[in-house]
Curated annotation (Swiss-Prot):
NCBIfam families xrefs: PRK00110.1, PRK12378.1, YebC/PmpR family DNA-binding transcriptional regulator
The name this protein goes by in its record: Probable transcriptional regulatory protein PEPE_1240
A molecular function GO annotation: DNA binding
Family stated for the protein in its record: Belongs to the TACO1 family.
Organism: Pediococcus pentosaceus (strain ATCC 25745 / CCUG 21536 / LMG 10740 / 183-1w)
A cellular component annotation (GO) from this entry: cytosol
PANTHER family for the chain: TRANSCRIPTIONAL REGULATORY PROTEIN YEBC-RELATED (PTHR12532:SF6), TRANSLATIONAL ACTIVATOR OF CYTOCHROME C OXIDASE 1 (PTHR12532)
Annotated localization: Cytoplasm
Pfam families reported for this sequence: TACO1_YebC_N, Transcrip_reg
Annotated HAMAP family: Transcrip_reg_TACO1 (MF_00693)
Region (Disordered): 1-21
UniProt key word Phosphoprotein: no
Length: 245
């Protein structure tokens, strides 16, 4: 697992994402819709829906928006979405995984390929970069929200089944096996911890530093991918120079 903080990357792009909040809500609504279609409207018996609702709350998505997405998914008919994963290399050989939810594979594939090509990258075959990432549960607790002793919190996380706890000045980052993620999340919430973030994600085993002369090209690629309405998540094995973040 890379030693570079995933939370650092999340916070580093927060302002840009805030400006795209409407699109983020639209994507999460689509993910909630698909989760309800697949497993029903009750999050207690639909783990994927619970995960998407947690994601919605973490993004400060209004409750009315969440309810509308659940109600829409509970109705008959509607679009059929398919989850597709693309893998490729950005400028300077940075590994990138793109997760998309689409009702038109040809449209999405063309747009993703164009983004990579336009910004000096290349779209690869399935498996070309995914081996560089590990599927992990990822939970964040802010120091500001911590009411307990730090050692007690770390012990609670490990006892709940976490694989690793990393600390920084601002947060505790808790990593779990994907199969243990829900159990660890629920155990920590049951003990009264406030979770700043909780998700299943892809963690790079190593990260490539993007050279300064490639930063604009690289961030342009990530921005174009994230601006695509069909794209749900972009996972990066890259670190930007501090003055570029």
């Amino acid at each position: 697992m890379s030693g570079h903080s995933k939370w650092h990357n999340i916070q580093g792009r927060k302002n840009a994402q805030d400006a795209k909040r409407g699109k983020i809500f639209q994507r999460i609504s689509r993910e909630i819709y698909v989760a309800v279609k697949a497993g029903g409207p009750d999050p207690s018996s639909n783990p994927q829906l619970r995960l998407m609702m947690d994601k919605a709350r973490a993004a400060n998505m209004p409750k009315d928006n969440i309810k509308r997405a659940v109600d829409k998914g509970s109705g008959a008919g509607g679009a059929n979405y398919e989850e597709i994963t693309y893998e490729g290399y950005g400028p300077a050989g940075t590994a990138i995984i793109v997760s998309a939810l689409t009702d038109n594979k040809n449209r999405t594939a063309a747009a993703v390929r164009s983004a990579f090509t336009h910004h000096g990258g290349s779209l690869g075959a399935s498996g070309s970069v995914s081996y560089m990432f590990d599927r992990k549960g990822y939970i964040v607790i802010s120091r500001e929200d911590l009411d307990k002793n730090e050692d007690d919190m770390m012990e609670d996380a490990i006892d709940a089944g976490a694989d690793d706890v990393q600390t920084s000045e601002e947060v505790f980052e808790i990593y779990t096996d994907p199969k243990e993620f829900a159990a660890v999340r629920d155990a920590l919430e049951a003990k009264g911890y406030t979770l700043a973030n909780a998700e299943l994600t892809m963690i790079p085993e190593n990260e490539t530093m993007v050279p300064e002369d490639k930063v604009k090209q690289y961030t342009g690629l990530i921005d174009e991918l994230e601006d695509n309405d069909d794209v749900s998540e972009v996972y990066e094995a890259a670190t930007l120079p501090e003055d570029a973040e």
